[in-house]
Amino acid sequence: MQKRKLGFAGPHVPIICLGGNVYGWTLSEAETFRQLDMALDAGLNFVDTADVYSRWVPGNKGGESEAIIGKWFAKTGKRKDVILATKVGNEMGEGKAGLKRAYIRQAVEDSLRRLQTEYIDLYQAHKDDIETPLEETLGAFDELVKEGKVRYIGASNYSGARLSEALETSCKHNLASYISLQPHYNLVERQDYESDLLPVVKKYQLGVIPYFSLAAGFLTGKIAANRTRKRPSEERWCKST
């Protein structure tokens, strides 16, 4: 599979990233294992998850996706074959959210335990936390990089202005810097990324890992725009065309 460098200083990764938000949701543990096996056999070894996946499923508490991936690592012994990305900062319940130093320190240990690994290749801020100074957040990430628990850091769901401010903060204080951005971007919804984020991505040479890149399946053709009955999640894409 074709690979390219992730951002200005990241690892070389496949041009496709395998998202794990359905693990523990629409895919069972056994189905997830089969998917991961098939992906690696095809050369797709870039896997992205988050601590919050799949907390929204009734009966789940969060961390299910990470835990299933961790079990797969334990079963196959293929941790070193995978470029592993996960995220921190989204709502996990009981006050567990945000990007304060203390919470990042707690959350990374929880993720490492669930993933059954000693390090995370790409640790991403899942969304901006305007209540926490950027220097505090980036300082916490910098500590994790220096300790070897995290190799690279990235951002997701930031505005262009805040992303630029974060990158300048890292430069000013000599802290670990975001090498990648995970934005909502596809051929249906382009405006926010192209007008606000793309200039920052180009200026700082960030890698981009878009989510909803197929518009939740709409761009595959599986959802007909004129279909009489649509799931609520499908309505948004059909109205955008």
Task: Indicate where each model-derived feature is located.
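N-terminal binding-site loop/beta-alpha segment at the start of enzyme catalytic domains
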Residues: 1-81, 146
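Conserved, mostly hydrophobic/aromatic
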Residues: 6, 18, 32, 47, ...
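Short, well-ordered coil/turn segments that N-cap beta-strands
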Residues: 11-16, 43-45, 78-82, 116-121, ...
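Active-site mouth loops of central-metabolism enzymes
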Residues: 19-30, 91-105, 127-132
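Short, acidic/polar
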Residues: 27-40, 98-115, 163-168
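Charged helix-capping and loop-helix junction motifs
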Residues: 31, 62-68, 101, 105, ...
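Structural motif corresponding to the early beta-alpha repeats
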Residues: 52-53, 75-99
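Beta/alpha (TIM)-barrel catalytic core signal, keyed to glycine-rich beta->alpha loops juxtaposed to Asp/Glu
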Residues: 128, 132-241
